[in-house]
Swiss-Prot record:
Lineage: Eukaryota, Metazoa, Placozoa, Uniplacotomia, Trichoplacea
Cofactor(s) recorded in Swiss-Prot or TrEMBL: [2Fe-2S] cluster; [4Fe-4S] cluster
Region (Linker): 147-191
InterPro entries for the chain: Anamorsin (IPR007785), Anamorsin_N_metazoan (IPR049011), CIAPIN1 (IPR046408), SAM-dependent_MTases_sf (IPR029063)
Keywords: 2Fe-2S, 4Fe-4S, Cytoplasm, Iron, Iron-sulfur, Metal-binding, Mitochondrion
HAMAP family linked: Anamorsin
Region (Fe-S binding site B) residue spans: 239-253
Region of interest called Fe-S binding site A, as start-end residue ranges on this chain: 204-219
Organism: Trichoplax adhaerens (Trichoplax reptans)
Protein name, UniProt field: Anamorsin homolog
Quaternary data: Monomer.
Free-text domain note: The C-terminal domain binds 2 Fe-S clusters but is otherwise mostly in an intrinsically disordered conformation.
Amino acid sequence: MESVSHLVSNGQSVLLVWSQGGQLDTLANFTSSLRERVGTNGTVAVENINRLSQSSYGSSTFDVALSNVVSSYCCKHTSEQLAQILKMLKPDCKCLLRDTSPSDQIRSELILAGFTNISIVAEDNATVKVNARKPNFEIGSSAALPFANKISLGGNSKMETAKMWTLSSQDFVDDDIDIIDENTLIEEDDFLKPDPSSLRSQECDSAKKKRKACKNCSCGLAEEIESEKKTNGNPVSSCGSCYLGDAFRCSSCPYLGMPAFKPGEKVALPSRLLQADV
């Protein structure tokens, strides 16, 4: 009891956490000593460390939390158990615990759980005794920042802000306001249709490589190439002289006996030439 007498006083609510392996007689005697210390106005709640998450105590219930301080048996606290103890403590209240983790590790675990003012009270080869404190605010609470205060404008700030962004109808007849004429934003040259050759990329006019329209061509090269394909799509014979007449035709030319025609002219063969010889 001497080791915790400076933490417990009359009228306080104390959370006593014990673990499996501890002697029940020692736990009962220690609990009785705590109840004598807090008096009739205080309370002592005894909870097993493995059942903290199932306890019915709410947030900010206890003034002091004592964990694993009853007997020589000690265990390692998990991050969930430390967070549960922090939740049950009132703001700016202390916690005394013993743990089997190294001092640096248990200090880090307590910091991650939300404790502050962590100090190592005693340490030996197997256990470490640590004092920690819950911050002087509730978990999840909020506070207004000093620079977030609104600056007074000498009146109603909302009305002043609305007035700042309001354009009065009287402003349109004020001679001091320079209003841009929308007709001056576009010049006469902007209405002229541009020459397609001026819109064509330099790569389109390159003579070193085959002309090929770009994807989503907008300079007119795609339409020009398409029209050239239609113009140059005339039938061409293997010898290239069928249109000159029989004197220039091969012996197997299907145009034998037909008059000469113009290059590219569509010529219909007689039906007798389309029938197979028997």
